[in-house]
Structure formats: C-alpha cells, structure tokens
C-alpha cells in the first residue's frame, strides 16, 4: 500500500516525460535527420493516395522491400499536443466548467463539420467548395440536419460525382491502351529513385504506367545512337480554372472608345491595367495569364472605369497543393513544429480572404508608388470561377533497344513533384525540398536527377530531367527545355538515390509540360535534340551556331523569342554535333575531392578570358511589336555591365562514372552583346557545348572519366529556385599541381580585391574513405553574409580529399553583384559551422525572399540548391551556398511569413526600478546593452536569417523584457516553436553561466503576422495602443488628462502637476475631456477659471448688476429722446419747404380738394374731372370770408379766370367751382380735405 502511491507518481512522471519529449524534439535531431527517416514518409505516400496512384510505385517498392505495415503505422501516428489546446479554444479564467465544456463542444462540432465538408468536396467532386456551398453544408452539419455519413451519401449520388468517375474511367482506359504499345523492358533493371515515390499521379491526371516503366527501366545493352520506336501518348485534357473579377479604377474617365477593343485608348488602358494588376497574381501558384474582358461605365457615378477581367489558373498546378493546404489549415488545432509547410499564397484559393489578398496587394502597389493606376480595393469583386478543359498532347516517349536513351515523360516528373508535397496528415516532413508550386514568384520549373545502381550491376544510369513548365500569354512565347537523360557505364557498387527539385524564375506561373530533349552518348560526343510539341503551333526560326575553332563564339538570337524551338528529326546529328561533345580522358589512380571557386579565371586552361554576360531581365509573356528576326547580338558595348567576374568551380571527385552536369535557364535577354570565349582544354579535344535556345546560351564541355577505383559515390547537382545567372561550363582534366596553382591564384586575387573582402574557400583534409552528403543551402540558411571584416571568415570550411586527377572544371560566369560563397563541413566527430542550421525549422523549402528596401548586401539571391543524398552517415555534410547575381530589377516579394517575431521573457532575480521606464536613463541603457550582448550572439548563431534584435521596453514584474527580432528573409508562420525552443535553451544557459534567472514559463513568442504588437507594448489602463497599419509599429497614446513623462506609463495630470488647480481647487479627470478643476464656493464668493485662478464675490456681482441695469435704461432713454427730436426736426423742415403765398399755392390746394373729392364716395360722379390733379395739397386750410364771393382769399371771378385759362371744359370748371364753394361752406368737408392732405404728405 505504501509503494502504490510512489509507483503511481513514478508512472505519471514517466508519462509526462514521454509527452514532453514527443512534442519538443531536440533541435539537432530535428535539423539533421537521417536519410532513412527523411525518405520513409515518401514511400508511404503511395498507399495514402487513391488506388490508381500506387501503380507506378512498383519499381520503387521492388528496390526497397520495406515493411508496409510498419511504415503505415509510423505514418498514421498523429502527434500529441504539448499543452492543452495550444491552437484551439482557450479556457478563460472567468468561465464556469459548464461554459468551458459547451464552448469546447461547439468548437468540436465546427471542426468536425469543416473537415467533413472539405473532404466531401475533395473526395467526391474533386474541387473546392464555393462560399455559398460551404456555408450551406456547414449549416446543415452544425444544426444536425445532416450527419457526415449522410453528407457523403448525398455527394456520392450526385450527378457531378458520377460524371467525374466516368471521365476518370475513360482516361484510364485510354492510358492502358496506349501503354500496351510500349516495348517491354526487363524488370530486374528497374531503377528506384532514392526511396521517393516518383510515380504518384496528380489527382486530376491519370497514371501513365507504360510511360513510367519505359522511362525508368533500362536494359543491359551497349550504348548506341540509333532511335527506333517513337510512341505518342494519348491526349489528356488538363483542367484550367478561370476566375472573373471586376474592379473600379479611380482617376480614369470612361469614354466610348473603350468599347472598341481595337482602339488606341482601349489597348493602352488594357496594357497598363494588365501590367499593374498582374503583380498581384504572379505570386499565386498556377497563375497563367490575365486578360481584360471589357471596360464599363460605372453605374453609381460617372467618375472612374469598371474593369471586368479574367485570370486563368492551371488546375494541375494548384489542385494537389491546394487540397493539402486546405487540410493543413483545417487541422491547425494539431499544428506543431515538425509539420512545416510554408504558408504560400496557395491558401488564398481555399480561404475567404482571397479577395482581401488581391485587394491589399493592389492597394499596396499604389501607395508605394509602384502603380500608375488607382484601383478601389473595396470595389474588387470575384464574379465567377469556372473550370475549363484544355487538350494537351503528352510528350513523346523515346524507347531505344540499346538503352542509351531513356526519356522520362514530364508528366511522371510532374506527378513526382506533386507527390513530394506532404499531405495535411503528415507528421514528418522530408528535408529534401519538393517542387513547391507556390514558392517561386511567377512560376516554377522542376528538374530531377537520379542515379541508381543495384549491387552487382555494372550499369549506372545518370538521368538528368528538365521538365520545364512556363506560362503563356500567347502560344509561341515560351521557351521550354526538355527532359534530358544520360547513360554511362560505371562499376557501380553503392546504391544511391539522388532526388532533387529546382525552380527558376520565368514570366508565367502556370506549369506546362512541353518538349523532350533526347540525348545520346557515343564514343566521342553527345547529341542533343529538342522534339516538337503540339502545344505550340507557331514555329520559331533556329539560329545557326558557328564552329568552335580558335575564335570566340558569338551566338545570335532574338530577345523577343520566348517560345520553344522545335527541331526536326533530320537535324538530330547535323545541328547538335557542333553543340555537345564529350572527350574521354584517362585519369590518375589517386583520388581527390576539391571544391575551388576561382574568382578571376575564365576557362579550364587557367588563362584569363574576356567573358561577357548580360544582366537578365524578368521574362515577359507579352507580344513584341518588333520583328522576330531582329538580332540581339549588337556591337554596342555601352550596354554591357560595368563589372564582370568569372567564377570557376573546380569539382574533383572520386566518382568513377561519367559525371553529367547540365544547366539550363529560361530568361528573356536585353539587347546586349554576348560573346562566349574560346574553350581550350588542358588535354584532349574537349569541345564546349552551346545549347541552342532563344533564352540562354551556355558553354559546356563534359569529359568522360574512366577510373579503376572500385569505390563509387554518385552525386547529382540540382539548381535551386530563382536562378538569375548565365553560366558557361567547361570540363577538362588537369594535373594536381595546376589545381594547386589555381587555388593559390584564387587566394591571391581574392585577398587583393577591394570590392569583396572575403575568401572563396579554405581547404581542410578529411578521411578519403568518408562518404559525404553535399547540400547547398538557400540564402536564408547561409552561414553569413558579405562582410568587410576578414576575421569573420574563420568559420568557413571546405572539405576535400586526397588529390586525384579526375576533375570536372566548371567555369561560372556571373555579374559581380554577388553574395559571398560560403562552405561549411559537418564531420562525424566535429561540427564546424558559422551558424547552427535550423533550416528545417525556418526555411524548409529553401525559398528566399527579396526585399526591395534592403541594402545591396541583403539583395543577394540564392543561386543554386544542391542536395545529394547517399545511404551513408547522415551527419557527414558539406554545406555550400553558391553566389548568384543580386539583380536590381527584381521586384517580386513572396510573403510566406513575417519578417518580425516578438517575444517576451521575465527575469526573476532582478529588481525593477522606475528608471527602467525611461529609455534615456542610464539604468535602462545599461540593462538594454546587457541583454543585447547576451541575446544577439545567441540568436544570431542559432537562427538563420536573423538580422537584429530590438528591446521594446522593460516592464514591472521583476523585470519583463519585451523584444522584437527582425529577419532578413520571411520566416514561416510556425517559426514560433523554433524560437521558443531556442529561448528556452537560452534560459537554461543564462542561469548556469550568467546567474540570470529567467522564468521559462513566462516565455511568449509570436510571429509578426499573427502577433498583437500592443501586447508587447504593455500599455496601462490610462492609455490606448495604436498600430500603424503600414509599418506595423505599435505605440501607447495616453487618454485625455493623462501624460507620459520620459516614456513612463501614462499618469494623471493631477498626480504629475499638484498645482494644476489653484486656490484649493480639486483636480479631477473627466473621461474624454481631460483634467478639470472643481473650484471652491463660499456663501457670497467663489473661484472660477480653468485653474480656479479668478476670485468672485456676491456684493460685487450685485453692484455690477445694478449699474448695468441703470446704464441700459439711460442708454434707452437717450435713444428715444434723440429719435423724437429727429422726427420733429424733419417735420419742421418739411413745413419750411412748403410755400404759403402766390398763385402757385392755389392750384395745389385746389388739386388737393379735387383729390379729396375723387376719393369721397359722395362725389363718385365727379371723379373723372379730378384725375389730372395729383399734387400734394398744402396743410394750410382755406379760410372762407363772410361773403360768398371770396373763397380761400380769392374771389370767384379770379378763380373762374384761372380755370378758364386752363384747358378744362366748361362743365369741369363749373364742377370745380361748386367743390370750392362746398369746401368754403361745409366745415366737415374742409376737415376731410385736410386729412387727405396729411396722408399725401
């Protein structure tokens, strides 16, 4: 009974330890996985896919008899979460148990329904759900109307599902019938491809068993140049998706000419719109082209133009990766550090923020000044998404009885790269980078090189395949390099698998397989020929390559040619014989492995030559108005770059088989002259090779090495994504003393260089029997960047073996704008690296991201990615970062993650002081410098791409350090786990070495795209956090009435300024208004003012009030008095102006009387005679005399004479006389006349 509790505790401790160890693997184990662990998941891909997908993996399974059940068990194990609900529903402290359970049940229903809906569409309809469809099925599932099994039944019985099955069956039957025509090959010679399932077809593409076995199997016969059977595969339709958008352009005026597609305005606006908007789509996987459908006048207002355009995506390129990322994001509740897929823009196909992604990109281009158009992001609408079928003829499969040529159909390689994508259920991610359809900005190009030789088999096949895939805007405008397969004889002893993937920058983003290059190796030369493809209908004239004699070779072509160049079968030997030749040389018996970069020598002869390269420009798929026959080889040397630097790569290996290394890139040239130098081999008739294409010319000479050494190491060289360099390669043999001389010259020349003060390589010896794993890291995993200090170069190590005369000289011609070449070595018992490699955590796929705002030292592009795997010790590794041209014309930015990572930690054995709030204080600066000195070297040595560290602030709570890390390259969203483990290890190291106690449980790490910057600003309750939407910077802003002094937390003005309110006033904070003062109030006095600075008394107020009233009364009285006086003066002046004597008065008086009579109703009958007298009548009355003969001072006779002298008639005169008599005799009538006079006045 006593031992039982103890045993239970021990068991619980062991269980917790197992859980923790399961979720937090060590960094070293995660970074350097063994080859078997890396390649096991790839073998398991076949049984996780449909049954038809596993047919082509039979060859792999024959060579790798793995335990299927064991592998399946390891594959299907899902990792436990390290903590409770790390990415799911959180438990809030204020929640009750019932609420927490209800929330978790609700979250569980949502997650299950999401999975069910996604899987139903994926399984039965093989497409993505629309927004309405998704919400419809989600509502049915969440409401319990339809169960997940009923949902599957409904989907399986749908018409769309049945038509999809019929279409798949039809394609499968055509494939089987076509595969029966291929010639049989012995099964025993089937080569396995490094435990990688290469034959997994795309979900929308049928399996090609016949093509795969024809390309993977090789009979044991002698090498020959004869080509016999040519089999054309069946035509299969490839899916395309067309998304139609509409957007409103501001600042453009609609005109009728825009309706005519042939008008100048329509074409000009169309070209301008496509060039601007295309940047938002080029980073998306599967993007092919964009075209404008029409321009419309806006409905709401007359300003601007509505543009309707369609974007075409390749369904083959996005379907598989899209589904994987759908499952990945829908399963994010179980996301952990081992599943590390970059968050590519493929996600926007499956998440509702697709519109926001495009709109944000367009808006950023306009705000940054990169766009002349002003699109309205709110007006962007996704109108329709439809799928179309395009017919594409499969590549020709060349079958030769002599097994000298075995071409791999590019569809197989395409399926290989698609299969290399881990699905959403993967818990182990391979370190070998698959073809990432969304990692390169505009497009991706895959290459595969493998070599397999079973024990006892003396035939080793080196296959170099280039399934080039490019996008088109018009049919003849894409250059394609075809699959290349080389065979050679070697005493193969060691079985090695060398899967490699590569990508190159091109104009289009969709993936089109076209053309197959067929190569034959004879005794003295190799022949290359490109086969015609039916996907391009317009032929392009071939350019003639002059002979390779004692003069420089100039190659002319057209910079406007970007289509593939078809060759006829009749030119198989005539045109290619001058292009590619391999000379046999007999090497010495000693073995040596060297890697030497010569910074100033041009060819294998060790002599300086004038190699001229042209700067590559971004490929454009637009048609050119200039003729195709215009040569790009001109004599204008002013267009040449200012500085040219040749890089010579000397590879001396202990390989006994023929090393075939080939490189081809697709670019569009500027109009610049290009000359290739004369290649003079040291011994033997080695002749350079010029690949006849319109996009790149490269000189290549491949010697055939024959050695008696029994040991074999098979290596493959693969180009990495985003290659921007022209390469001239020559191969020859030389003796070891010349190699030493070249090495010395390299060191002298590089040491004397003033522009680049760094070494190309250092040489150290390793055991000759050691087999190494060569890996060229991408730029984000470089050991360091260019520096002017030679002291930092002590970490650069180059591995080499004892000397041998088997050498392959590679002369790489590049521009001088290059990042440094860095080489590091990992031995069994010693690790010598400048940076601890956590590439699996930070940048697994190996993509690099170009930031235009960075300085020149940060603009370098990774030039190549070489990963060669063997079946030997996985810890023996040589890492090489090849330099490439950091072109200034690059403008692609891929946003797979953030450039910033926030983290905070708590130091428990240090006391906080108020001075740590002030960033200008000595204590703050001292503590900041201490943490920078501790953290920066540690982070720089453990984090790839680490740029700088910024201490944001110190906060109380012992001491809480909030920091922000910046990276030179974007990091994956799930980088938090890696940073967390590194900081956790730092906490332990700091406590053991510096007595700095850091609480591990206080670590908080968030990436910049997911983090809340305000969280790390620690704004208090008196402030708010504001985030700059463009820079992402956060700052605290105090509320009104609060103030931050010396960057301390916001405090009240009442506390900071005790004398804010005077005269004993009370300070108070009014929310939204700020600080106010509440002043004192007495019985008959009080204080007032903003700061209570004014004294007010009641008697004074009363006196002022009385005085004010009296003053107003006086003012009103004065105004009234002056108004009355003014009226009187006006009246008197009017009276003085009116005369009283003379004859002039009488007519007026008479007229007034007449007017009065006129308006008197008593005298209506007499109005007509009074109309002509309208003058004012004086205010003086007529005075009647005693006699009736005198009226108004005039006698009747005088009045009669006055009227008679006028023009009045007799009747009128008599009437007026009667009126006058009435006026004189009737007082009332006289008063009436006077009233009329006053009114007239």
UniProtKB/Swiss-Prot annotation:
User: One biological process GO term for this chain?
Assistant: visual perception
Q: Which parts of this chain are annotated as the region Hyaluronan-binding motif involved in chondroitin sulfate A- and C-binding?
A: 1125-1133
| Localization per Swiss-Prot or TrEMBL | Photoreceptor outer segment membrane; Photoreceptor inner segment membrane; Secreted, Extracellular space, Extracellular matrix, Interphotoreceptor matrix
GO CC terms: cell projection; extracellular matrix; extracellular region; interphotoreceptor matrix; membrane; receptor complex
Biased composition annotated in UniProt, kind: Polar residues: 189-199
Q: Which residues cross the membrane?
A: 1100-1120
Entry-listed glycosylation sites:
154, 190, 192, 301, 320, 370, 544, 556, 942, 956
Entry superkingdom: Eukaryota
Q: Where is this region: Hyaluronan-binding motif involved in chondroitin sulfate A- and C-binding motif?
A: 1210-1218
Sorted alphabetically, which keywords does the UniProt record give? Cell projection, Disease variant, Disulfide bond, EGF-like domain, Extracellular matrix, Glycoprotein, Heparin-binding, Membrane, Receptor, Repeat, Retinitis pigmentosa, Secreted, Signal, Transmembrane, Transmembrane helix
What protein is this chain from? Answer: Interphotoreceptor matrix proteoglycan 2
Name of the gene encoding the protein in the UniProt record: IMPG2
């Amino acid at each position: 009974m006593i031992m039982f509790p103890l045993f239970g505790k021990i068991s619980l401790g062991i269980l917790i330890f197992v859980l923790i160890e399961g979720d937090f693997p060590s960094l070293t184990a995660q970074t350097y996985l063994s080859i078997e662990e890396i390649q096991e998941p790839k073998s398991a891909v076949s049984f996780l896919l449909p049954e038809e997908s596993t047919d082509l993996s039979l060859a792999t399974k024959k060579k790798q008899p793995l335990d299927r059940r064991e592998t399946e068990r390891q594959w299907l194990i899902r990792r436990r979460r390290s903590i409770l609900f790390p990415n799911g529903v959180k438990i809030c402290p204020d929640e009750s148990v019932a609420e927490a359970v209800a929330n978790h049940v609700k979250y569980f229903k949502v997650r299950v329904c999401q999975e069910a809906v996604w899987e139903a569409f994926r399984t039965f309809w093989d497409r993505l759900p629309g927004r309405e469809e998704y919400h419809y099925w989600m509502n049915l599932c969440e409401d319990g109307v339809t169960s997940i099994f009923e949902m599957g039944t409904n989907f399986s019985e749908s018409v769309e599902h049945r038509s999809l099955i019929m279409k798949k069956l039809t394609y499968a039957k055509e494939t089987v019938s076509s595969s029966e025509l291929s010639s049989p090959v012995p099964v025993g010679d089937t080569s396995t491809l490094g435990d990688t399932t290469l034959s997994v077809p795309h979900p929308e593409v049928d399996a090609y068993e016949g093509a795969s076995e024809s390309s993977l199997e090789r009979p044991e016969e002698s090498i020959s140049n004869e080509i016999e059977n040519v089999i054309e595969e069946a035509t299969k339709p490839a899916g395309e998706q067309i998304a139609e958008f509409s957007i409103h352009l501001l600042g453009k005026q609609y005109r009728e000419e825009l309706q005519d597609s042939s008008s100048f305005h329509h074409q000009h606006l169309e070209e301008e719109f496509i060039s601007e908007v295309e940047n938002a789509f080029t980073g998306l996987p599967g993007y092919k082209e964009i075209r404008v459908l029409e321009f419309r006048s806006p409905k709401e207002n007359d300003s601007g133009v509505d543009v309707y355009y369609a974007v075409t995506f390749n369904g083959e390129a996005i379907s598989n990766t899209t589904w994987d990322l759908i499952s990945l994001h829908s399963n994010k509740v179980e996301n952990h550090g081992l599943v590390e897929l970059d968050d590519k823009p493929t996600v926007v196909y499956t998440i509702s923020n697709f519109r926001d992604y495009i709109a944000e990109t367009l808006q950023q281009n306009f705000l940054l000044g990169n766009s002349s158009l002003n699109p309205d992001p709110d007006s962007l609408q996704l109108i329709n998404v439809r799928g179309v079928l395009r017919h594409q003829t499969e590549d020709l499969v060349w079958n030769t009885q002599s097994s000298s040529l075995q071409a791999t159909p590019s569809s197989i390689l395409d399926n290989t790269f698609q299969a290399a994508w881990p699905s959403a259920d993967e818990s182990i991610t391979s370190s070998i980078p698959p073809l990432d359809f969304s990692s390169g900005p505009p497009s991706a190009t895959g290459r595969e090189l493998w070599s397999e030789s079973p024990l006892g088999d003396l035939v080793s096949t080196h296959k170099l395949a280039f399934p080039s895939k490019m996008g088109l805007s018009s049919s003849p405008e894409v250059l394609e390099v075809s699959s290349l397969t080389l065979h050679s004889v070697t005493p193969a002893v060691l079985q090695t698998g060398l899967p490699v993937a590569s990508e190159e920058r091109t104009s289009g983003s969709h993936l089109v397989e076209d053309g197959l290059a067929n190569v034959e190796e004879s005794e003295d030369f190799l022949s290359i020929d490109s086969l015609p493809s039916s996907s391009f209908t317009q032929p392009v004239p071939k350019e003639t390559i002059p002979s390779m004699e004692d003069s420089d070779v100039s190659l002319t072509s057209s910079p406007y040619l970007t289509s593939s160049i078809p060759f006829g079968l009749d030119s198989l030997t005539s045109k290619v014989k001058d292009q590619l030749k391999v000379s046999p040389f007999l090497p010495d018996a000693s073995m040596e492995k060297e890697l030497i970069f010569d910074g100033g020598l041009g060819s294998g002869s060790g002599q300086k030559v004038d190699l001229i390269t042209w700067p590559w420009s971004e490929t454009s798929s637009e048609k050119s108005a200039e003729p195709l026959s215009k040569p790009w080889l001109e004599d204008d040397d002013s267009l040449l770059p200012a500085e040219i630097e040749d890089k010579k790569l000397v590879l001396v290996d202990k390989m006994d088989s023929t090393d075939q290394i080939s490189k081809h890139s697709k670019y569009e040239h500027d109009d610049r002259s290009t000359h290739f130098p004369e290649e003079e081999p040291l011994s033997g008739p080695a002749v350079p090779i010029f690949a006849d294409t319109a996009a790149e010319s490269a000189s290549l000479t491949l010697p055939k090495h024959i050695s008696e050494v029994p040991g074999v190491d098979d290596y493959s060289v693969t180009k990495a994504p985003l290659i921007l360099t022209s390469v001239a390669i020559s191969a020859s043999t030389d003796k070891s003393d010349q190699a030493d001389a070249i090495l010395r010259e390299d060191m002298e020349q590089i040491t004397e260089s003033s522009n680049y003060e760094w070494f190309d390589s250092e040489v150290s010896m390793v055991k000759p029997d050691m087999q190494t794993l060569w890996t060229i890291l991408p730029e984000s995993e470089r050991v360091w960047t260019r520096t002017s200090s030679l002291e930092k170069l002590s970490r650069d190590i180059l591995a080499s073996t004892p000397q041998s005369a088997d050498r392959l000289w590679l002369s790489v011609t590049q521009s001088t704008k290059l990042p440094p070449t860095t080489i590091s070595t990992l031995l069994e018992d010693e690790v010598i690296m400048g940076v601890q490699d956590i590439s699996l955590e930070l940048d697994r796929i190996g993509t690099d991201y170009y930031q235009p705002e960075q300085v020149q030292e940060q603009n370098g592009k990774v030039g190549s990615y070489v990963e060669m795997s063997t079946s030997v010790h996985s810890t023996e590794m040589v890492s090489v970062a090849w330099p490439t041209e950091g072109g200034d014309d690059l403008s692609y930015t891929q946003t797979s993650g953030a450039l910033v990572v926030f983290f905070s930690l708590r130091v428990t054995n240090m006391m906080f002081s108020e001075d740590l709030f002030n960033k200008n204080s000595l204590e703050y600066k001292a503590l900041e410098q201490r943490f920078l000195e501790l953290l920066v070297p540690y982070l720089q040595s453990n984090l790839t791409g680490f740029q700088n560290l910024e201490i944001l602030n110190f906060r109380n709570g012992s001491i809480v350090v909030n920091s922000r890390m910046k990276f030179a390259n974007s990091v994956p969203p799930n980088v938090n786990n890696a940073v967390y483990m590194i900081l956790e290890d730092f906490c332990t190291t700091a406590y053991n070495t510096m007595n700095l106690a850091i609480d591990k449980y206080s670590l908080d790490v968030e990436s910049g795209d997911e983090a809340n910057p305000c969280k790390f600003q620690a704004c208090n309750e008196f402030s708010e956090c504001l985030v700059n939407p463009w820079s992402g910077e956060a700052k605290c802003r105090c509320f009104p009435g609060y103030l931050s002094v010396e960057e301390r937390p916001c405090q009240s003005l009442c506390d900071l300024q005790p004398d804010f309110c005077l005269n004993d006033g009370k300070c108070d904070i009014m929310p939204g208004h700020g600080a106010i003062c509440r002043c004192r109030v007495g019985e008959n006095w009080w204080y007032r003012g903003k700061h209570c600075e004014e004294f007010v008394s009641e008697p004074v107020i009363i006196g002022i009030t009385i005085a004010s009233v009296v003053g107003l009364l006086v003012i009103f009285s004065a105004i009234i008095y002056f108004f009355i006086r003014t009226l009187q003066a006006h009246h008197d002046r009017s009276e003085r102006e009116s005369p009283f004597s003379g004859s002039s008065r009488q007519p007026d008086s008479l007229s007034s009387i007449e007017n009065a009579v006129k308006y008197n109703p008593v005298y209506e009958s007499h109005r007509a005679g009074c109309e002509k007298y309208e003058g004012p009548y004086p205010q003086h009355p007529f005075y009647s005399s005693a006699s009736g003969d005198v009226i108004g001072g005039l006698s009747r006779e005088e009045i009669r004479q006055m009227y008679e002298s006028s023009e009045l008639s007799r009747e009128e005169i008599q009437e007026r006389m009667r009126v006058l008599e009435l006026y004189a005799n009737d007082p009332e009538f006289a008063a009436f006349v006077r009233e009329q006079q006053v009114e007239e006045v």
